[in-house]
Amino acid sequence: MPRSLKKGPFVDGHLIKKVDVQNEAGTKNVIKTWSRRSMIVPAMLGHTIAVHNGKIHVPVFVTESMVGHKLGEFSPTRTFRGHVKDDRKSKRR
């Protein structure tokens, strides 16, 4: 169930403050965050945000098509190593 439109998007306060400070200064430094639940808003366009995936911070460059999604969607938490190869020759013996 999506968030109500009358509430507006959720962005952690500390994250939006860091983005606003960089927008005013005109800098585009990497912003580290653990807030995977924050929604990407238009103020974040062009910034690189390093989102924590539980182990490391994954850099995410925010583009226009990402607006409305959450930061955690672009930082995968699980590593897929692939399925085990089906070795039929060894099963015959």
From Swiss-Prot:
This is Small ribosomal subunit protein uS19. Belongs to the universal ribosomal protein uS19 family. NCBIfam families: rpsS_bact. It comes from the Bacteria. The keyword RNA-binding applies. GO terms for molecular function: rRNA binding; structural constituent of ribosome. Residues 83-93 have a biased composition (Basic and acidic residues). One of its GO terms (cellular component) is small ribosomal subunit.
